[in-house]
């Protein structure tokens, strides 16, 4: 895809691809996306993954949202994401917590060892 291409994220959000780099050594595309969502919240990772996978004709499980940064009150977010050629490469390179985030599963935090009966 050429740079400055538009991607519809949702009814209230639209993105513009600012940079699209093919990293042949690793086997992935590295994309910087600027998302405009005036008057609404930051789009979810699932919405972004769905829109990008449709725009680039790739499977949703091969798209990883690395970072979403939004300035307070601006209605504009910068999104860094990667599209991999295979799931094996993705799992070797990307951290597990990011894959869990994109899948919508929550990791369980350490917490106390005492459990529910810790207070006496």
From Swiss-Prot:
| Keyword terms | Ribonucleoprotein, Ribosomal protein
Q: Which InterPro entries match?
A: eRP_eS24_sf, Ribosomal_eS24, Ribosomal_eS24_CS, Ribosomal_uL23/eL15/eS24_sf
Give the region (Disordered) as residue ranges: 101-120
What parts of the sequence cross the membrane?
none
Task: Give the GO cellular component terms, alphabetically.
Answer: ribonucleoprotein complex; ribosome
GO terms (molecular function) for this protein are:
structural constituent of ribosome
GO BP terms in the entry: translation
Family affiliation: Belongs to the eukaryotic ribosomal protein eS24 family.
Q: What is this protein called?
A: Small ribosomal subunit protein eS24
Q: Which organism is it from?
A: Saccharolobus islandicus (strain M.16.4 / Kamchatka #3)
């Amino acid at each position: 895809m050429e740079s400055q291409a538009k991607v519809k994220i949702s009814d209230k959000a639209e993105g513009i691809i600012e940079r699209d780099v093919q990293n042949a050594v690793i086997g992935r595309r590295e994309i910087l996306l600027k998302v405009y969502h005036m008057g609404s919240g930051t789009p979810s990772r699932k919405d972004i993954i769905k829109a990008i996978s449709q725009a680039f004709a790739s499977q949703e499980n091969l798209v990883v949202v690395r970072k979403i940064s939004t300035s307070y009150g601006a209605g504009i977010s910068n999104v860094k994401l990667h599209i991999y050629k295979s799931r094996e490469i993705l799992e070797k390179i990307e951290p597990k917590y990011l894959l869990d985030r994109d899948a919508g599963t929550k990791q369980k935090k350490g917490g106390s060892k005492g459990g529910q009966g810790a207070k006496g």
